[in-house]
Amino acid sequence: VKCGACSAVCPSFRQDRRESQSPRGRIALIEAVLDGRLAVSDLYQDRLATCAGCMACEGQCASGVPVTSIILAAKEQAVQESGAGIVQSVLAGALRHEAVMRSLSWLAPVALHFSKGSVAGGGAGQGSRKIRNADYGMRNGSGQQVAARKKVIFYPGCAIRHFQQDIQQSTAAVLEHLGYHVVIPDDLKCCGRPFLSLGDRDGARNLAEQNTRVLAALDAEAVVTACASCGMTFKRDYPELLSRSGIRPAAVMDIHEFLADKLAASDLSTPLHGRITWHDPCHLGRGQGLAKTARSVVRRIPGVMLVEMDRPDQCCGFGGLMRAVHPALSRGIGRSKARDIIATGAATVLTGCPGCRMQIADSLRLEGAEVAVMHTVQVIEAALRSAECGVQSAEDREIEKVRN
C-alpha cells in the first residue's frame, strides 16, 4: 500500500487528489489509530467514508493487501468506540424500517425519468412507472399450482424492491419465458451490504441469518439476484457473517451468471436496433469475477452493437453509501463516468446493478445527455417479448417504412 500505486485507480483520490482520500492515506490513518497516535474522530470516520468499496485498489496492489476489508473493519471499530455519525445513523434507521423505504419509492422514477429513447424502446423511467401499480402474482408463491415447472427464487434487494421494480418485472419475465416459476418471498430482508458500509457488522449478521433461514426453507433450483452488490454480499460476506451461528449460506447466482448457462442466442428471436455500451459494476466485475460472463450475455442480444467505453470498470461513485455521505464527491465521480459513456456515442448504457443505474442516470442528466440507462434483463425481455413490451423491433421498423 505504501508504494501508492493504488492511488492511480482510486476514484475518490482521482477526483479530489487528497492523500487522506487514497487507499494509502486511509490505511495510514487506520495504523495511527491502532498505534494510539490518533483518536477516533468525526474527521477520521469521514475519511473512511470516502471509500466507495470498489476494490480497484486491491487489483492494483502487488502485495495483495485486502484494503476494502481493512477499511470495513476500521469502520466497525470506530462505530463501537464513538458511535455512528448523524447521516450514518439516519441511513441505518431508514434501512431497518420497510415502511420508510417504501415511502421513498417515488425517488426512482424521478432519477430515471429523463431517459428518453433506448435500444429497447421507451425510457427507463417508463418501466418504473408501469410496474408501480402492477401485481404479477409472484410473491409468496408456493409453486404448487405449477408443480411441473422448475422453480427459481428471485432475491430483489432493497434498490430493486423499493425503487426499480421494472428490473424485477423484466427478470421475472425472462425467467418465466425460459420455463421457470419465479418466487419472491415477502419476508426477505436487506442483504446487509449498507450495514457493513456503515460499520454495523452485527446488523449485517442479523440480516444474513434472517435471509438465509428464509431461503433455506424454500426448495428451488436456484436463488438469483439482479443486484451486483447483493450477489457479492451473499457470496463473499455471508460465509464469515454466518460462521458463528453455523448456518450454511445459500448459494446465490447473479442473473448474468444464471443466463450465461440457460439463455441461448436462439431464444432471442426479435432483433433490436441500437448502439449500446456496458458499465461494469464494481461488485459484479471485481466483486464476483463476472465481467466476461456479463458481456457474453449482452453479446447474445440480436441487432445491437456493443461499443466499449474507456475504463468500463471505473467506479460510478455510488458504492459504500458515498452518494448519501459524500454527495459532491459522488457526483464528481459519476460525471466522469457519464463523460466516458457519452464519448461512445451509444444511445443506451447497460449495467447489472440498480445502484449504478440510478447513479449513472443522474450523472448523465447533469451532463445534459439523453442516454437511456437500463439493466441487461430489460433489453433481454425486449428481445424476447417485443410485442408485449411495446418494443419496436428492427423488423417492425422496416415494415412501418414500407407502409408509409
Give short role names for the model-derived ranges.
Residues 11-16, 39-42, 93, 344:
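A ubiquitous short alpha-helical element
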Residues 67-389, 400-404:
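Iron-sulfur cluster-binding electron-transfer modules in prokaryotic oxidoreductases
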Residues 31-53:
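Aromatic/His-enriched, Gly/Pro-containing loop or helix-boundary segments
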Residues 13, 33-37, 285:
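Alpha-helix C-capping/helix-to-loop hinge sites
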Residues 14, 34, 58-61, 195, ...:
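Short amphipathic alpha-helical interaction patches enriched in hydrophobic/aromatic residues
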Residues 1, 5-29, 50, 54-77, ...:
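Iron-sulfur cluster-binding cysteine motifs and their immediate structural context
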Residues 3, 7, 45-58, 188, ...:
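Residues immediately within or flanking Cys/His clusters that coordinate Zn2+
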